Amino acid sequence: MKLKQIELKNFRNYEDLKLDFHPNLNIFLGQNAQGKTNILEAIHFLALTRSHRTSHDKELICWSGQEMKVSGLVEKAHATVPLEVQLSSKGRIAKANHLKENRLADYIGQLKILMFAPENLELVKGSPATRRRFMDIELGQIHAVYLYDSMRYNRALKERNAYLKFDQAKIDKNFLTVLDEQLAEHGNKIMFERKTFIEKLEIHAKKIHEQLTHGLETLKITYNQNVKTDFSKELLSRQDHDIFRHQTTVGPHRDDLQFFINEINVADFGSQGQQRTVALSIKLAEIDLIFEETGEYPILLLDDVMSELDNHRQLDLIETSLGKTQTFITTTTLDHLKNLPENLSIFHVTDGTIEKEKE
C-alpha cells in the first residue's frame, strides 16, 4: 500500500496544495510552525476522517474557507483507489472510488496508517482513555466489524447513561435491562477483539523489544479487562449502583493496558528511555501485525520523533520500516538522521510553501 498523491483544499494553512510522493521515503524538512505536521495530519485525516491533534473540526479549515477537502490516490496490489474526505458545516463526507461511503466502517481501512509522534509516549504513561483509543484506532483499521461494534456500543452507552440521569423514581428497570442487553451484545465482541489483538501484538512487540535491548529486557503487555465475569450479569447486578451514580460503571469503556519490563511497571517505575523503547517496540510490532491480519503494510508517519531517539533506535526504526512501509518523516534538520537510503524525496517547508528537492 502506497500513497501516491495528496491534494489539500483549505486544510489548515494550505489553501490549495498537490503533492506527489516517493513510494519509499518522504522527508518534510523545515523549522517549527511552518506546516510540516499539517501534511502528516492531512494523511491521518484522509485515512481515519479524524485529526490526531484536535477534536475540533473547525480548526482544520483554513481561515479563508467555509469547507475543506483532502483527497489522495492510494496504490494497492491490484488497483489505484482514489479517496476523498470533505468537511463543512453540514458534516463530513467520505468517498472511495468516487462513491460516498454511508458508514465510516466501510471507509476506514482503505488507507492504513501508523502514526508515531512524541505524544505516543502517552500510550505508556498517559491516561487509560489514551490506551483505549489506541486499541480502537488500530483494530478499526484491521477489522471493519470492530469499528461497527465500537460505534454501536458507544451509541448504546450514551443512551444508557442518559437514561441513568433520570429521576430514580422514573427509571423502569425492565427498559434498563433492554439497554443492558444492547450494551452487552456489542461490548462482548469488543472485549474479545481487544484481547485477541493484544495477545498477537505482544508476541511481535516482545520479540522486537528483546532485539532493541540486546536481550536484557523482556516486555509484557497486560490487557486489563474491566468486565471480570459475565457482562450481562455484571450490568444487571450494578443497576442500583449505576442508578445512584448516574453512569455506567462497568464495561469495555473502562478497559486499560499495562506494560511491564522484567515484571516492573514501565509507567510507574520505568525511565523515559525505557518508555520510549516500549512505545517504539509497539509501533514496529504493529507494522508486521497489520500485514499479518490484512495482507497490506500500513503507511508510517513519523512526526518529529527522530530527534527524540538516539542513533541506535533511529537505525532500528529505519531498518525495520523501510522496505516494508512507505514512510513520511517531519524534521527540522537532517543532521540526526543517519543511514538514509538514496531513493527518497525531500520536501522543504517554509511558511506553508513546499518545494520538492530535485532527486
From Swiss-Prot:
Do you know which InterPro entries this protein is assigned to? DNA-binding_RecF (IPR001238), DNA-binding_RecF_CS (IPR018078), P-loop_NTPase (IPR027417), RecF/RecN/SMC_N (IPR003395), RecF_2 (IPR042174)
Give any GO molecular function from the UniProt entry.
Answer: single-stranded DNA binding
- For whether the record's keyword set contains Nuclease, the answer is no
Identify one Pfam family in the record: SMC_N
Q: Quote the PROSITE patterns the UniProt record gives.
A: RECF_1, RECF_2
UniProt-annotated location(s): Cytoplasm
Q: Principal place where this protein is found?
A: cytoplasm
Q: Which Gene3D superfamilies did the record assign?
A: P-loop containing nucleotide triphosphate hydrolases, RecF/RecN/SMC, N-terminal domain
UniProt: ATP binding residues: 30-37
Keyword field: ATP-binding, Cytoplasm, DNA damage, DNA repair, DNA replication, DNA-binding, Nucleotide-binding, SOS response
Which BP terms does GO give this entry? DNA replication; DNA synthesis involved in DNA repair; double-strand break repair; SOS response
One GO CC annotation: cytoplasm
Highest taxon of the source?
Bacteria
According to its UniProt entry, the function of this protein is described as: The RecF protein is involved in DNA metabolism; it is required for DNA replication and normal SOS inducibility. RecF binds preferentially to single-stranded, linear DNA. It also seems to bind ATP.
Q: Which NCBIfam families match?
A: recf (TIGR00611)
Family membership: Belongs to the RecF family.
Question: What PANTHER family does the record point to?
Answer: DNA REPLICATION AND REPAIR PROTEIN RECF
Provide the protein name.
DNA replication and repair protein RecF
Q: Which source organism does the UniProt entry give?
A: Lactococcus lactis subsp. cremoris (strain SK11)
